[in-house]
Amino acid sequence: MLHKEAVTPGTLELLIEGIRFASLEDIAAMKLNAVIGNGTRLKDFVDIAYLSSYLSFDQMIDAYQKKYQTRNPLIIIKALSFFEEINFKEPLHIIIGIYKWKSVEKRINQMIKSPPKTFPPFS
């Protein structure tokens, strides 16, 4: 279920063939919130790493703060840095490319070290 407030006004009203679409900012905010709330889902970490090709970590944090105003943004860094509880046995379906955890982990660490930067797509 989508949070009723969109980071970018009007984006949750975008319908294509009856499917409601959220902006990348809204998706990033929801993914960060998911990692903070339950840091066990591998998919959330992978999605955040893949989003870094389109949004900087600063933009993701800004989107998170706009969508979830009561949350402390410093928790994001802590949650993204804690990999010990991720369920690596969870089935993961990647549409484009091949998933490699070491690449995802490296990207997340790069995002934290260089928040204003966007990164090239995974190869």
Regions found by a protein language model. Give the residues of each.
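Compositionally biased terminal segments of proteins
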Residues: 1-123
